[in-house]
Amino acid sequence: WEGDDGLDVPYQDMILYKVHVRGYTKQYKLPAKEKGTFAGLGEMIPYWKDLGINAVELMPAYEFFEILPEEEKTGMVTEKRREGKVNFWGYMPGYYFAPKSAYCATDNPQREFCDFIKKLHKAGIACIMEMYFPAEINGVIALRTLQFWKLYYHVDGFHLSGEGVPMKLILRGKLLADTKLMFPGVDMDSAFH
């Protein structure tokens, strides 16, 4: 990690910029290979610095299905019916322990995401990951997901959404005690006091 330890931007000082990895970088004058990728986001850092941004929130950027299968009422699924609807946003269960490979300019999603985080931190910008946990998720899996992204990828915080967020379990653990946690309806400053 070349000395990277993450950033601790106080809530009251945070100037947060929320982006969708694919959607945000498609419009910019980037090399075609970098459009819609973590590498492409890395090229936006000087612009964010000019705006005074000190934290970037990534909408779901973990591995998730892009094509949603259609539910069949009766009968068998056929090849024709496999197309489904495109899931652009990622607000669904996924493979929570992996960066979205479709958001990579390289064939190494882990390395590309780590390089992006290091660039952000060198520029003084924190990374907040938005994670969606549905009601049916095991709370321990959700907790381990957050711990993993903090330890392995040096993510600075999380915006948690969905009915399956185990806030009590998350708040009891010490590993996330110095991590930014945002959750609708919870005043995080008072939650720890």
Task: For the regions a language model picked out, list residue spans one by one.
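The feature marks proteins involved in alpha-glucan
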Residues: 1-18, 26-32, 36
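Catalytic domains of carbohydrate-active enzymes, especially glycoside hydrolases
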Residues: 43-62, 152
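Hydrophobic faces of well-ordered beta-strands that scaffold small-molecule active sites
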Residues: 15-17, 56-58, 127-129, 158, ...
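Active-site-proximal helices and loops of the catalytic beta/alpha 8
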Residues: 91, 145, 151-193
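Conserved, mostly hydrophobic/aromatic
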Residues: 19, 48, 58, 96, ...
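Active-site-proximal loop/turn and secondary-structure-junction residues that shape catalytic pockets
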Residues: 62-64, 102, 131-135, 164, ...
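Aromatic- and acidic-residue-enriched carbohydrate-binding clefts of CAZyme catalytic domains
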Residues: 30-37, 68-122, 133-155
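Surface-exposed amphipathic alpha-helices with a cationic face
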Residues: 46-49, 114-123, 168-176
